[in-house]
From Swiss-Prot:
Name of the protein: tRNA-cytidine(32) 2-sulfurtransferase
Other notes: The thiolation reaction likely consists of two steps: a first activation step by ATP to form an adenylated intermediate of the target base of tRNA, and a second nucleophilic substitution step of the sulfur (S) atom supplied by the hydrosulfide attached to the Fe-S cluster.
Cellular localization per UniProt: Cytoplasm
Free-text comment on the cofactor: Binds 1 [4Fe-4S] cluster per subunit. The cluster is chelated by three Cys residues, the fourth Fe has a free coordination site that may bind a sulfur atom transferred from the persulfide of IscS.
């Protein structure tokens, strides 16, 4: 009997284990380089910093903690890391996952228990997104804990794509050119917030989290809401990236390459002084429009 071979169309090529390991090592090295570069560029970590790493149980915060642990092993300055999670009392939240994981890797941690879930679901009208209020309450709880424990820095897991998306959300919905900075001082002036994943793409984080097999905890509070503005912007950016590969990276670079004289913000550039040949006060808009205003008729 002749041997029967499978159709070419039924054969699925699988990468060799050695190749997979090499690709994973290259990915980890790239992430370490990008995180280390961001830390250096923005002065995120100083000697003897006591850093609170906000761990939600999502891919971003797991990757953040993992990268900081790897970099700390060979860092030029000593610093401490403590993972902190806010248990918002969401129904079905697997409380055992984070303690078991953090204990297994020997990372000090603390779980803050605060029922923000009931407050948010009670206060926000049905059909409205919960993210804004949830974020404010979560931030308040984390900041309060950081203050009581004397943390010098608060590390968040926002990545490059988050920062680009925030820029467009502010552009589209608030008419302003602002985004999500890699490092900032909190509104109350008491905390320094850092985002070490500022140079890392979401695609790489997804691949890294998958390779490391982190015990991901989905967000059932806001993750299932399909009408979020951020998701809409995300769809737009992914479409751009698919049609024009590298576009998100170009936009991210542009956020650090501002030319105030090429925009129109008078607080950043003195347009009034440009080309002036005398010190005579310039007429204001009312003076320029005086003729039109005089001819206006009352409604």
């Amino acid at each position: 009997m002749d041997a029967t071979f499978p159709s070419q169309h039924n054969i699925t090529a699988r990468p060799a284990p050695g190749r997979i390991r090499r690709e994973q090592c290259k990915l980890a090295k790239r992430l370490r380089r990008q995180v280390g570069q961001a830390i250096a560029d923005f002065g995120m970590i100083e000697a003897n910093d006591k850093i609170m790493v906000c761990l939600s149980g999502g891919k971003d915060s797991y990757t953040l903690l993992d990268m900081l642990l790897q970099l700390r092993a060979k860092a030029p300055v000593p610093f401490e890391l403590t993972a902190v999670n806010l248990d918002q009392k969401q129904p079905g939240f697997p409380k055992h996952v984070l303690p078991e994981y953090l204990s297994s890797i020997g990372v000090p941690y603390h779980i803050i228990e605060q029922d923000t879930y009931s407050v948010v679901t009670r206060v926000v009208p049905e059909g409205k997104t919960l993210c804004a209020l949830c974020s404010r309450m979560r931030r308040g709880a984390l900041y309060a804990y950081a203050e009581t424990q004397g943390f010098t820095k608060i590390a968040l897991g926002h990545h490059r794509d988050d920062m680009v998306a925030t820029f467009f959300m502010n552009l589209f919905h608030h008419a302003k050119l602002s985004g999500m900075p890699p490092k900032l001082r909190s509104d109350n002036g008491k905390h320094v917030v850092i985002r070490p994943l500022a140079y890392v793409s979401e695609t790489d984080i997804i691949a890294y989290a998958d390779a490391r097999e982190f015990p991901i905890i989905p967000c059932n509070l806001c993750g299932s809401q399909e009408n979020l503005q951020r998701k809409q912007v995300g769809v737009m950016l992914k479409a751009w990236e698919k049609e024009y590969p590298g576009r998100i990276e170009q936009i991210a670079r542009a956020l650090g390459n501002i030319r105030p004289s090429q925009l129109a913000d008078q607080s950043l550039f003195d347009f009034l002084a440009l080309g002036r040949h005398s010190n005579t006060p310039l007429p204001n808009a009312h003076a320029w429009l005086a003729g039109d205003l005089a001819n206006d008729t009352a409604p």
